[in-house]
Amino acid sequence: MKKITLLTIVALLSFGANAQSLLPTKYGIKVGLNIANVTSTPNEGVDNIETTPLLGVAGGFYMEIALNDKWYINPELLYVQKGASFNYDYTHKWDSIGTNQTNNEDKYGTTNSLKLAYVELNPTISYKASDKLALNFGPSVSFLISEDFVPIENIIGDNPPQNAVENKLATYASEDLDVGLNLGISYYLTENFLVDAKVNTGFMKIGAVNKTTSTAKNGNERIEKVFELNNRAIVLSFAYLF
């Protein structure tokens, strides 16, 4: 019994020492600019996809946990704006019921705006190469809290669309979770003030632009999904530590 009690005390003391070593050595706030974009995988009938980065804000809480004099864990909890503006052309294929009109086509060009807001958790691992410079890497877990998708379509060519009634505007089907990877560097201007730059690459599909590009009448295959999207971003930020 005495041995068990002694071992328990030693284990508790050891756990307490390890837990104390994982307490944050510094807390801080981080504010910056997020240069966001998306990558896409188009389906049949979709052409000329062009994306334009969206500028957003990124900010939240930041801390440093020293493992030793070189290695740190730097968790972040941030509000981040992502998304992009993107254009694409597509062909709307349709057949007429009860007539001999088959394989008809209308060509459209589109302009789209997608704005997303996330709460992002970044358990970053940091290696201090010097007193001023640190190399950072780690996973990123993002939870979607809001979205805004605005599609605009225009017919390509001089002729009006023959089947505009059935050609509905595109919709966006979002995913609530995104998991990715952060790679970056930090430069300490002072002991408590640093500049941070990182690249974020999302691994999961964040959503899909849905659009009926073939009505599937008279035996044709119905095509509804235009393309799926993934997040990409460059983040430039400042952090102040207390």
Segments (PLM) and residue ranges:
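Membrane-embedded beta-strands of outer-membrane beta-barrel proteins
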Residues: G59-F61, L121-P123, L183, L236-F238
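Extracellular/periplasm-exposed beta-strand and loop segments of Gram-negative cell-envelope proteins
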Residues: N37-L54, K82-L116, L144-D178, N182, ...
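Repeated loop/turn-to-beta-strand initiation elements of outer-membrane beta-barrel proteins
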Residues: W71-I73, K132-L135, N192-A197
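Residue-level signature of outer-membrane beta-barrel architecture
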Residues: L33, M63-I65, I125-Y127, F143, ...
